[in-house]
């Protein structure tokens, strides 16, 4: 198999709560797969548009020259969806920065951040740990005076 020059690829991760999605972005023809399945096959169906937001915002032509493969682990269904969309967005920005030009990368970044900051910046909120003296992080056990 003849090689077509050096392999142009970037590896980026997206996170939400405990879900982590790792995206490999390389030169290709517009393929986006998550755990080996196309974006349209990902459940839950109600959050399908959340996954497609980066593609719809930036247009298919920006994704036409790249293949993105995402592996996602941990968390629940919703957290995984948010991790996937973040990793796809970050992968495209990183690819454009490394292999295309700085101006188009800045344009992409500005569009994404103006729409929704969590597409590029991780949400730092985490679950607060349980403390003694109560059933949860803040709730206390009921107390009686007699």
Swiss-Prot record:
Organism lineage string: Eukaryota, Metazoa, Chordata, Craniata, Vertebrata
Q: Keyword annotations for this protein?
A: Acetylation, Cytoplasm, Nucleus, Phosphoprotein, Ribonucleoprotein, Ribosomal protein
Gene name tied to this protein: RPS16
Q: Return the similarity comment.
A: Belongs to the universal ribosomal protein uS9 family.
Subcellular location, in the record's words? Cytoplasm; Nucleus, Nucleolus
Q: What Gene Ontology molecular function terms does this protein carry?
A: RNA binding; structural constituent of ribosome
Organism this protein belongs to: Homo sapiens
Pfam family for this entry, one? Ribosomal_S9
Superkingdom of the source species: Eukaryota
Q: Name one GO biological process term.
A: cytoplasmic translation
Q: What is this protein called?
A: Small ribosomal subunit protein uS9
Instruction: Output the Gene3D superfamilies linked to this UniProt entry.
Output: 3.30.230.10
Q: How does it assemble?
A: Component of the small ribosomal subunit. Part of the small subunit (SSU) processome, composed of more than 70 proteins and the RNA chaperone small nucleolar RNA (snoRNA) U3.
Q: What is its main location?
A: cytoplasm
């Amino acid at each position: 198999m003849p090689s077509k020059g050096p392999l142009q690829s970037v590896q980026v991760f997206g996170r939400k709560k405990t879900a982590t999605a790792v995206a490999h972005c390389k030169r290709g023809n517009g393929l986006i797969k998550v755990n080996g399945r196309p974006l349209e096959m990902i459940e839950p169906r109600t959050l399908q548009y959340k996954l497609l937001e980066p593609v719809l915002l930036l247009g298919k032509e920006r994704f036409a020259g790249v293949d993105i493969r995402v592996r996602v682990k941990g968390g629940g269904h919703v957290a995984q969806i948010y991790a996937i969309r973040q990793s796809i967005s970050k992968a495209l920005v990183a690819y454009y920065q490394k292999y295309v030009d700085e101006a188009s990368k800045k344009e992409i970044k500005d569009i994404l951040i103006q729409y929704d900051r969590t597409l590029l910046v991780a949400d730092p909120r985490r679950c607060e740990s349980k403390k003694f003296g109560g059933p949860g992080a803040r709730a206390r056990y009921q107390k009686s005076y007699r």
